[in-house]
A protein has these predicted regions:
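Intrinsically disordered, low-complexity terminal regions
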Residues: 1-277
Length: 277
């Protein structure tokens, strides 16, 4: 999709007026950051373009490896890593220096990227943001906030409060959730709520264009509010009471178990499936 946008933009300018930056990636340079922490760390990560991988380890410290990728030394050197620590709060922000000269200069980041490979304690609060890239997280207990401008999000064995959003990409989240807010601008969403998950506050799960699958454990209580603009709703082996609307049509409301906070499911174009985990 980005390539199509790029070509459309390029066609707007006459020959000789555009300086295009971007080529096949040829070099990779690694930069490592290490932070000593004494309690539960709060880790804030961001990269302008590139994937983010987050894994727990058995050390109390936080390690971030930045893989800078570019077509030559100049491209690599234009990638800047900003790192700071205040107590147990760790921030790593990777940015690409912008080019500018006479006339119109179009910079396209497929010539540069920065992947983050992160190791941290299993009990951590994590915020991760990629301007254009996938995010992959596993076995983290704490508050987790994941955001991608354009890329898939995968998370496994999480425990706690989770917020996740992507402008364009699929999402798969598995774990024991309390609070949950999930949105994809364009992509399917699958949520596997493990035993012990509770709607401690309202859950909001939505996609602009794609299917939603929510798997919940036995005994899960909430007020279901599901709607699809163009699709069907399937409720498989899940007892509902106080049902409003017709199951398999585009809107269903009802009580799950003993009720509780709201679980809202919304898709503009796609099916919604609710089943046991």
């Amino acid at each position: 999709m980005r390539a199509a946008i790029f070509l459309a933009l390029l066609s707007l300018f006459p020959a000789g007026c555009v300086d295009i930056v971007g080529a096949d990636i040829q070099q990779v340079v690694r930069e490592q950051k290490h932070f000593s922490t004494t309690g539960k760390p709060e880790v804030v990560l961001s990269t302008f373009d590139g994937s983010i991988e987050i894994r727990p380890w058995d050390k109390p410290d936080v390690q971030v490896i930045v893989e800078k990728r570019g077509r030559d030394d100049a491209a690599i050197s234009s990638i800047e890593v900003h790192a700071e620590q205040s107590g147990n709060r760790v921030v790593v922000d990777v940015k690409a220096e912008k080019h500018g000269d006479r006339g119109f200069h179009l910079t396209w980041n497929f010539g540069r990227s920065a992947k983050l490979i992160v190791s941290l304690p299993a009990e951590s609060d994590v915020t991760a943001k990629s301007g254009d890239g996938s995010i992959d997280v596993e076995r983290i207990t704490g508050k987790v906030d994941l955001r991608s401008g354009d890329g898939s999000i995968r998370a496994r064995e999480l425990s706690g409060e989770v917020n996740a959003s992507t402008g364009d990409g699929s999402m798969t989240l598995e774990g024991k959730f309390g609070a949950l807010r999930v949105h994809s601008g364009d992509g399917s969403v699958r949520i596997h709520a493990a035993p012990g998950s509770t709607a401690a506050s309202d859950w909001d799960i939505s996609t602009g264009d794609g299917s939603i699958t929510l798997e919940i454990p036995d005994g899960f209580g909430a007020e279901l509010d599901a709607h699809t603009g163009d699709g069907r709703i399937h409720v498989n082996e899940i007892p509902l009471s106080n049902v409003t609307g017709e199951i398999r049509r585009n809107t269903v409301r009802g009580r799950l178990g003993s009720g509780g906070s709201a679980v809202r499911l919304r898709t503009g174009d796609g099916s919604i499936t609710l089943r046991r985990s």
